[in-house]
Amino acid sequence: MSKILVFGHQNPDSDAIGSSVAFAYLAKEAYGLDTEAVALGTPNEETAFVLNYFGVEAPRVITSAKAEGAEQVILTDHNEFQQSVSDIAEVEVYGVVDHHRVANFETASPLYMRLEPVGSASSIVYRMFKEHGVAVPKEIAGLMLSGLISDTLLLKSPTTHPTDKIIAPELAELAGVNLEEYGLAMLKAGTNLASKSAEELIDIDAKTFELNGNNVRVAQVNTVDIAEVLERQAEIEAAMQAANESNGYSDFVLMITDIVNSNSEILALGANMDKVEAAFNFKLENNHAFLAGAVSRKKQVVPQLTESFNA
């Protein structure tokens, strides 16, 4: 039997990397599975900081599961096929550990699925470590903590579940870090956008959603200065338009999130700007608008877009 590949979504963030590495380890220890954590893209700057801090080598990047000789895969931090490996429909999905909506997903065989409405996939994996009585190595605890911090913006996002607030201090202790100090340093490491090209910037953390027959690209970047990002608006818009044309996106929505003040600016281009405006009850001026209190794509952007596009 070939090795089972474990991976998060395309354009992996800290939770995609952390949950996949942690679950691959747990699957070996608890279930005796022959697993390998891989990635569907190179780590972003935040995740690179995490891996370096805990001395963990980045998972190797793959573009095809079958090309690796894999017959089975385990998905973490995602389930929608368009967010997964290119040939996901050609391999068996052995299992899924996720905290997102379930959409565009079907399998030919029964599978293991663990879905919980918590702040991160890493939160679920940590609970599974405890359920199976498997000791958590320091570096694995650090990766799971980082995934939780990243997805909940240090427990400030509305996606934060009461369970996450219990888990975070436990993981911080296991990882040997101060939760607040490490969390802030980690989040700030991911806000260095000046060195990124516009094409790189809009692809740092981007996912495609099928909304009533439209392929809508929703990306998010974290910053400490929204105005600084908007100084590059023309360049960013050109990259968004090119992405729409080359990938068949009907619309591109970019969240520029201020992690200090917990607000976002929405920059949007495409064929359905009326639906984008209706989703958030705002008016786009020069293609962008302020969205007070919005920091979560999963809870404060995608559901609203889904409702508007389906109206």
Curated annotation (Swiss-Prot):
Cofactor: Mn(2+)
One GO CC term on file: cytoplasm
Annotated TM spans: none
Protein name as it appears in the record: Probable manganese-dependent inorganic pyrophosphatase
Similarity section: Belongs to the PPase class C family.
Highest taxon above the source species: Bacteria
E.C. number: 3.6.1.1
Residues binding Mn(2+) 1: 9, 13, 77
Cofactor note: Binds 2 manganese ions per subunit.
Main location: cytoplasm
Keywords tagged on the record: Cytoplasm, Hydrolase, Manganese, Metal-binding, Phosphoprotein
Listed HAMAP family: PPase_C (MF_00207)
GO molecular function: inorganic diphosphate phosphatase activity; manganese ion binding
Alphabetized InterPro entries for the sequence: DDH_dom (IPR001667), DHH_sf (IPR038763), DHHA2 (IPR004097), DHHA2_dom_sf (IPR038222), Mn-dep_inorganic_PyrPase (IPR022934), Oligoribo/pAp-PDE_c-di-AMP_PDE (IPR051319)
Binding residues for Mn(2+) 2: 15, 77, 99, 151
Catalysed reaction equations from the record: diphosphate + H2O = 2 phosphate + H(+)
Protein localization: Cytoplasm
UniProt PTM: Phosphorylated on Thr residue(s). This phosphorylation is StkP-dependent in vivo, however, PpaC is not phosphorylated by StkP in vitro. It has been hypothesized that StkP-dependent phosphorylation of PpaC in vitro may require specific reaction conditions or the presence of other interaction partners.
Cited NCBIfam families: PRK05427.1
